[in-house]
Amino acid sequence: MLITTTPFIEGRPVQEYKGAIYAQSILGANVVLDLLAAIRDFIGGHSKSYERVLARAREDAMKNLIKEAEKLGANAILAVDLDYNTVGPQGSMMMVSVSGTAVVL
């Protein structure tokens, strides 16, 4: 599956548009990670714990997006867009939303 953030691929014309596709991944962040992140943010370090959680959520969302494209018979996803949000009580969960256009090249 070819995946790109651009709306087209030079030299690879779109043969068929299959449609817009969407996927999400929501992961909870536990209290210990929140505390460690707050301490690291306070002293100016990076929060590796949050980075790992976000990377996992992004990977899950992308896998789900690929599955949606495959269901439609696409071999590429164009114009991929990722958005990050917090959801739940007091932003206790992280959500990655991803969208794109499923196509046949």
UniProtKB/Swiss-Prot annotation:
Highest rank taxon of the organism: Bacteria
SUPFAM superfamilies named in the record: YbjQ-like
Record protein name field: UPF0145 protein CCNA_02462
InterPro entries: UPF0145_dom_sf, UPF0145_YbjQ-like
Family (UniProt): Belongs to the UPF0145 family.
Transmembrane segment boundaries: none
